[in-house]
Every structure is written in structure tokens, then in C-alpha cells.
């Protein structure tokens, strides 16, 4: 409770906004080097969803106590209910988060270690695809379906994350004045 006023400020200055934008740019630059095969740190991955959600917590958590939650999915639900982000974006991020976490968990179970990267080996990719329910008879079709879904999910996250400081999602200028 003592740190709440420092984390969830009732008023934000432009310096905080600039700092958040700098972090977003740094994440984007680092992700450009990462492959889409990394479901956590790659472009459109879990980290981008978490950063997106945490940015809204930082910006609006001071005035909206319902956003002061630890879970990404719970905060997404509150952002949807508070109409701070479009329902469609909240739905996309929620589905993507669940899908990417499932992929991540299957990767970690298969590798028996903490990993977030899908192997470039087709046999290993197919094994993950089958574990996730991509059960087409032909290996190539199952793998193609899984990789297509993965690209679509991560592309949807990326599109929303890229628009974080656009008028599509926030009237940030109004929030800090």
C-alpha cells in the first residue's frame, strides 16, 4: 500500500509518457532481431501483450482501482469493461495470450526446460502442432495450419502493440493533462 501512489499515480507527467514510449521502442528494436518462432519475446509475442496491458495499468491505474491486478487476463477484462480499449482488441489479445501460453507450455514440456522458441526442426514443430490439437492426417498440412495460426495470432498482437501510442487506443495526451 505504501508504494501504490508511486506505481499508480493519479496524475501523469509527460516524462512518464516519454519513458514508456522509450521502453516500447527498445522492445521493438530488440524484437526485430528475434524470430516469430519465439512466442514470448518475438514480434507479437507474450511480452508485447504484457507490456501493452501494463502500460494501461500505469496510465489509468491511479484513477481506476480495478486495473490494479496482477494477472494479465484479469486486467484485459477490466480494460474491456472500462472501455479503455476496443472490445475487439481485448478479445484478440486475450485469445492470443491464451494461445501463446499454450504453445509456450507445450514447448517447455517437450524440451523439459524453460524455453520460448519453437525449434526450426520440422519434426519437432510437427510434434508441438499435434500436441496442440493440429491433427490433420498429412504432416505438412497440420504443420502449415499450426504455423499459419501462430503467424496470424502474433501478427494480430503486433498490430495492436504497434498502435499503442496512436489515437486508436489512447487519448494519452488527455490522460496526462
Can you describe what each PLM-predicted range is?
Residues 1-177:
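A nucleotide- and high-energy phosphate-metabolite-utilizing enzyme signature
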